[in-house]
């Protein structure tokens, strides 16, 4: 019998200490990793609930195990809420992550060796869209499209390649692309060449839900996403689809790819979808975009180049070559100043993937803690101050003190 008073601090002091240290890091550092955010206490409460105890292979009303009547309620809430949020005909909320969601689409519609198209990883795509080391690149025949001379998606190249190769699947979406994507144009192309059109909106989902970024659902056969990042939910995946594809996708997720769903995570997804439907979430996402633009403009004014010239979303790539600095070096020195970001390749990057010539910055997390344009500009100046003089410990210490002053004014969790 378990004692509810037997806290984690008592049960496992070592782990508790690590968690508390991570909590302090999150409070004290400015988080600029574009794929990270802070979830609400309600999301965390659902994820830490007794639903973690229940096996529930199958779908609501059609389970392999008994005792799922309340589990069905939780999953159906998640399904109904995410469909309403994005205007989708059908949804699967069971994928454990975005990569699993993408793999399920491949399993549902492709056979090994089939041809598909996705955005080049080197120019802003995602590893699950055809990287040679990923399952998508090993088992299938990926054809990559990229960027034009303005560092925006080269739709003419995409159209030419699609007409030449006749892919069975066309993927839109990116992990490091700051501009809006023309989903309508790509959807028309997919119909023309007889391809399934899939959009991976993992990075943009929160913005889409709030109406500040184009919604791919009306134009795509399938839309996959994570539920964290800009959507601000737990770490997990979802698949939205036309009703005609529901059976194929559901069968691909279970039993094709996964066994038992993570019901505690699905419950947390349901909470996040409810939060995303509230009026305040739209205001939050508008601020996410405003903060990203303010950050980008500040960095440009301080002499840094932003890939594609700026941002229409929450994310941007900073080209560091003018500073004679690698992304790896910038990530490290900014971390010393308590500014967290990630190294990232830029288009036609001459450096290795674990070194890179750029960093990726995103505004969702700093916006969650209450930053507005003024604070975003401050952050931009902090970054520029560090990168202007990265080898001076006194300079790093000065910026770190300024970061501490700012983060104390805007706690993540009161």
From Swiss-Prot:
Keyword Secreted tagged: no
Protein name according to UniProt: Serine hydroxymethyltransferase
Site entry (Plays an important role in substrate specificity), positions: 228
Pathway: One-carbon metabolism; tetrahydrofolate interconversion; Amino-acid biosynthesis; glycine biosynthesis; glycine from L-serine: step 1/1
Organism: Polynucleobacter necessarius subsp. necessarius (strain STIR1)
PROSITE patterns to which the protein is assigned, alphabetical: SHMT
GO cellular component: cytosol
Residues at which (6S)-5,6,7,8-tetrahydrofolate binds: 121, 125-127
Oligomeric and partner information: Homodimer.
Main location: cytoplasm
Substrates-to-products reaction catalysed: (6R)-5,10-methylene-5,6,7,8-tetrahydrofolate + glycine + H2O = (6S)-5,6,7,8-tetrahydrofolate + L-serine
């Amino acid at each position: 019998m378990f004692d509810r008073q037997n806290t984690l601090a008592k049960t496992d002091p070592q782990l508790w200490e690590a968690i508390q240290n991570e909590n302090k890091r999150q409070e004290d550092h400015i988080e600029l990793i574009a794929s990270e955010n802070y979830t609400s206490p309600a999301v965390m409460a659902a994820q830490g609930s007794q639903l973690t105890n229940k096996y529930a292979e199958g779908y609501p009303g059609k389970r392999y195990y008994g005792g799922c009547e309340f589990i069905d309620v939780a999953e159906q809430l998640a399904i109904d809420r995410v469909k309403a949020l994005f205007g989708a005909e059908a949804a699967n909320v069971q994928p454990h992550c975005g990569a699993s969601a993408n793999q399920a689409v491949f399993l549902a519609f492709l056979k090994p060796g089939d041809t598909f198209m996705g955005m080049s990883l080197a120019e802003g795509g995602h590893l699950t869209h055809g990287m040679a080391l990923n399952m998508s690149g090993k088992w299938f025949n990926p054809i990559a499209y990229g960027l034009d001379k303005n560092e925006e998606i080269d739709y003419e190249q995409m159209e030419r390649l699609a007409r030449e190769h006749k892919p069975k699947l066309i993927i839109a979406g990116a992990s490091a692309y700051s501009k809006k994507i023309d989903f309508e144009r790509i959807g028309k192309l997919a119909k023309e060449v007889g391809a399934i059109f899939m959009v991976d909106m993992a990075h943009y989902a929160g913005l889409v839900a709030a109406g500040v970024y184009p919604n791919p659902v009306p134009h795509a056969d399938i839309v996959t996403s994570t539920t964290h990042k800009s959507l601000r939910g737990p770490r997990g995946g979802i698949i939205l689809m036309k009703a005609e594809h529901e059976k194929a996708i559901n069968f691909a997720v279970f039993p094709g790819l996964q066994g038992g769903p993570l019901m505690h995570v699905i419950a947390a997804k349901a909470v996040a979808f409810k939060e995303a439907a509230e009026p305040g979430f739209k205001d939050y996402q508008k601020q996410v975009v405003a903060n990203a633009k303010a950050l980008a403009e500040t960095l440009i004014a301080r002499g840094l180049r932003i890939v594609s010239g700026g941002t229409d979303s929450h994310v941007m790539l900073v080209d560091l070559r003018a500073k004679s600095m690698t992304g790896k070096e910038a990530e490290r020195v900014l971390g010393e100043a308590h500014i967290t970001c990630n190294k990232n390749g830029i288009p036609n990057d001459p450096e290795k993937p674990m070194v890179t010539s750029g960093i990726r910055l995103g505004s969702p997390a700093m916006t969650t803690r209450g930053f507005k344009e003024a604070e975003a500009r401050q952050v931009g100046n902090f970054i520029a101050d560090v990168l202007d003089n990265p080898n001076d410990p006194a300079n790093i210490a000065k910026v770190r003190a300024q970061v501490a002053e700012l983060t104390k004014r805007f706690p993540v969790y009161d």
